[in-house]
Amino acid sequence: MKALRTVSALALTLLLLQPIPVSANMAAPQDPDVGSSITFQRSDALAVTEEVLDITVTGSTAQITAAYTMTNITQEAVSTPVMFLAPNTGDGSVEVTLDGEALSWSVDQYALSFDSKVETEDWRYAVLTADGERTFSEELVDAITFQLDFDPGETSEVKVSYPYRLGGYPDYDWNAKRGVIYYYLTPAALWQDFQSLTINLYLDKDMPVIKDSSVPFEKVGTRTYQYTSDTLPQEDLSIFIDENVVQETIGFFRSPYTRMLFAFLLPPVLVVVALIVILIIILKKIRKHKNKSHL
């Protein structure tokens, strides 16, 4: 009877202590930063023959470096303003170089909201909002402008580099974790004589898998992917990265939703187990009592 009383007390305690589930909602996914290929005024005189785009992901951020091979296809000196969209210029991490030499640049800021869109103003690409005014909840995107000077027939490498914040849920430590990268390639439609595009994607151990992308990447190394083409894609670059299967499984058990579900289901399950144990004990006692009565 002592075992019966103990099991009964445990079952009653678990029943009384059963938690009331608390609703929890995931925050909206984080919007990715905005980055773009370069555009320039003298597209009639300068050709971009090659772009090498390196995207190196570390945690919830990426370092984007774009190298452009540009040639003055005229027999006269050419000077032109150049621009591209980039985030995070305020921390001084943006770099612009011409054949390895740093160039000075200026920045204009635009408000970025859910209804923002990329539009052209002559040769320029700018991010605009419906009313042109920033609200408290809006992010800012920067338009970087710099000057290039080319001698007749000169070929040079222009390189731009900046940090980039991933969209999605890159900071989560459970199975909702994922990252989104978006990069505007459409400004490159203004280029001429284009011959080669290479996109190198370097992922880290936290999100080592490409879940989906607008271009077909090929795996060329550990967490390293590459896309090459002799033409520009017809759409902007979008990349969705995620955890692998093992990480997803571990992340499932880290999820607050999973823990809440277990907390809700575990007490009833234990009560059922306790009742089964009680029933087994009672049946054993009944059987034992019957055996004694036959003696």
Model regions and ranges:
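Bacterial N-terminal signal peptides that target proteins for export
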Residues: 1-8
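Extended, solvent-exposed segments with strong compositional bias
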Residues: 111-140, 150-152
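Intrinsically disordered, low-complexity linkers and stems that provide flexible hinges
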Residues: 133-135, 142-152, 165-169, 174-259
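Bacterial N-terminal signal peptides
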Residues: 9-18
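Solvent-exposed beta-hairpin/edge-strand motifs
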Residues: 83-119, 190-213
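C-terminal single-pass membrane-anchor helix
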Residues: 250-295
